[in-house]
């Protein structure tokens, strides 16, 4: 699948093995990085990773699994299926600073606000920190969950590290001493797929889940402030039993708008943040799209970008005007710049259309054994009834009387 993210002046997207970065304000050439041509893993590192428990049956495809942009836009990091962790600087020009190796395949990356560390969450439930100031230093294990981690976030003051896992849990830990847990945010009934500390609200946490809800938390205390069921917005009116996950939650830089994307539905739901009411998200617009989006992001100008899952390249740009979100003209300079940059790599995006859901295997498996139980119960009752009937029939005299049996035998004495 394709992923997009915008920070500072940069619009960055990844698909398959390739990352493409476009500067929205400066006339700079787009930056393209192909992981299949990147530095290969040393043999000794490969042996160490296999001995650490990574299955050799999983083939390395060089596909990008996650990437992150620092708050200033000066650093970008990506991790791929080959277990690389590649760090870039973007100023004065793009440059690969280092290539390091992670123990297991990663699911999420997050920079500190100070941009001195990068936190990496992996599928085994561990979080490692990697230094930005010492770009070749090995990572340090910071904390672990008992199940796969799906997202990691940091508080704006870098005090807390927030982790979400497959087993419905959100954990808030002290970054400097992660063994000290500040709080748990508990309430989802399926895996937690997305985390966001929204701009302008540093004490809030927004979380999305495979249960189809978005929750708003005061994460330092673990208190839930608000919950939104995305089914209420007509996402699944035809099949109310269908399961779906909240795949992305983003907020505009001015902190006034929140956008929620649910996997597999051709729409994006917009909310406004009601600062007068604690933790309240007020429904605003529902953007009905021609196709399901791969991903969405806000840029530094509070514009909403939507990348559609299509064999024909379709990038949409929306602006908030007169209390509504309106589609921008295709001749918009920023949109043309992004479209032209992605056009050269679109063969990679076309190959990702229709791929299997990344959340499909994360849902809890429910067994409906009531019918089997009732059938077995009825079989036991029938068997017991037959036994009782047989016992009742066997207790009655079944022998013929002497008078009916003929002459009485004579004594021989």
Curated annotation (Swiss-Prot):
Alphabetical keyword list: Nucleus, Repeat, tRNA processing, WD repeat
Keyword Repeat: yes
GO molecular-function term, one example from the UniProt record: enzyme activator activity
Pathway given in the UniProt record: tRNA modification; N(7)-methylguanine-tRNA biosynthesis
InterPro entries per UniProt: Trm82 (IPR028884), WD40/YVTN_repeat-like_dom_sf (IPR015943), WD40_repeat_dom_sf (IPR036322), WD40_rpt (IPR001680)
A Pfam family it matches: WD40
Placement of WD repeats on the sequence: 101-140, 144-183, 187-227, 286-328
Region of interest: Disordered: 386-413
One GO CC annotation: tRNA (m7G46) methyltransferase complex
Stored Gene3D superfamilies: YVTN repeat-like/Quinoprotein amine dehydrogenase (2.130.10.10)
Subcellular location: Nucleus
UniProt-listed SUPFAM superfamilies: WD40 repeat-like
SUBUNIT field: Non-catalytic component of the METTL1-WDR4 complex, composed of mettl1 and wdr4.
Entries under HAMAP family matching the protein: TRM82 (MF_03056)
Free-text function comment from the UniProt entry: Non-catalytic component of the METTL1-WDR4 methyltransferase complex required for the formation of N(7)-methylguanine in a subset of RNA species, such as tRNAs, mRNAs and microRNAs (miRNAs). In the METTL1-WDR4 methyltransferase complex, wdr4 acts as a scaffold for tRNA-binding. Required for the formation of N(7)-methylguanine at position 46 (m7G46) in a large subset of tRNAs that contain the 5'-RAGGU-3' motif within the variable loop. M7G46 interacts with C13-G22 in the D-loop to stabilize tRNA tertiary structure and protect tRNAs from decay.
Protein name, per record: tRNA (guanine-N(7)-)-methyltransferase non-catalytic subunit wdr4
High-level lineage: Eukaryota, Metazoa, Chordata, Craniata, Vertebrata
